[in-house]
Regions:
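C-terminal tail/sorting-segment detector
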Residues: 226-238
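Terminal processing/anchoring signals of secreted or surface-associated proteins
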Residues: 77, 192-200, 215, 227
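Residue-level detector of functionally pivotal "anchor" positions at catalytic/ligand-binding pockets or at interdomain
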Residues: 185-210
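Surface-exposed beta-strand/loop patches in extracellular or lumenal glycoproteins
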Residues: 128-143
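Solvent-exposed beta-hairpin/edge-strand motifs
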Residues: 139-154
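Aromatic/acidic polysaccharide-binding cleft in carbohydrate-active enzymes
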Residues: 1-19, 28-68
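C-terminal beta-strand-rich structural cap/linker in extracellular carbohydrate-active enzymes
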Residues: 161-192
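Glycan-recognition and catalytic regions of carbohydrate-active enzymes
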Residues: 42, 49-122, 128, 182, ...
Length: 238
């Protein structure tokens, strides 16, 4: 699934994500990465996707123009896609996670659904409307959830917040807002570091250390959560 590709970016009259979707580009990105299938990211999309690339000529991506909201949204979605089995893609379609659309009471602007595989579950709530809204969602698995992606704070950096959701729960969402929850209990993480795209030399060697998602080196994980080790995202459940 994707919201842009090389043909659309080069051939269509509305080439960039902003031209095509406006602020819908944010919740649509979350939708593409969580509803089903394997998502595709096009060149430079993590900078905001607002550059038209000529694939017949050597057009350089402008890495100096960054959309922190899009960058941090994609960083979080990448990590969750790699580490949470409810967002995985199996070799056989019969083994894929189940996508369940949830009922949203009296609000046609909000889409809510879960992805479930065994005891792993992800809840996604998207506001496609142009104004902030309150939406009551039914059919949620009541209990402890961890908020991994929040449109209201993601531009400032990645974070994680623990919360309890009821089977019928009311969410307050900003315009074009989105939330992604993972079932279970994880340590909270505050937004505490500016994030940016950095160049990495191809000759740079793997130092074997563990890193948090904000890039902080640690000796070893001591809490549940997502970490980076040997270039891979690893979820620690203990």
């Amino acid at each position: 699934s994707y919201i842009t590709n090389h043909d659309q970016n080069f051939n269509e009259s509305k080439k960039t994500l902003t031209q095509k979707y406006g602020d819908n580009r944010y919740p649509l990105t979350v939708l593409a990465y969580t509803v089903y299938g394997m998502p595709l990211i096009y060149n430079g999309q993590e900078t905001g996707g607002n550059q038209a690339l000529d694939y017949f000529n050597d057009t350089k991506i402008n890495w100096n123009t960054q959309d922190e909201k899009m960058l941090n949204t994609l960083r979080t979605l990448f990590a969750l896609k790699h580490a949470v089995s409810a967002l995985s893609d199996a070799r056989q379609s019969s083994d894929n996670p189940t996508t369940t659309l949830l009922n949203v009471s009296d609000n046609t602007s909000v889409l809510a659904y879960t992805r479930t595989l065994d005891d792993s579950q992800v809840l996604v709530v998207l506001n496609m409307g142009t104004t902030a809204t309150s939406a009551t969602v039914e059919g949620i698995t009541a209990g402890e959830w961890s908020l991994w992606l929040d449109s209201e704070t993601i531009a400032q950096g990645t974070s994680r917040k623990q919360t309890t959701l009821n089977a019928t729960h009311t969410f307050n969402l900003d315009a074009k807002g989105y939330r992604v929850y993972v079932s279970g209990t994880y340590p909270e993480q505050n937004v505490n570091q500016h994030t940016a795209i950095r160049s990495i030399r191809s000759s740079q060697q793997d130092d074997g250390r563990w890193y948090t998602l904000t890039g902080q080196p640690i000796l070893r994980p001591t809490k549940r959560g997502l970490y980076i080790h040997h270039g891979k995202k690893i979820m620690i459940n203990q």
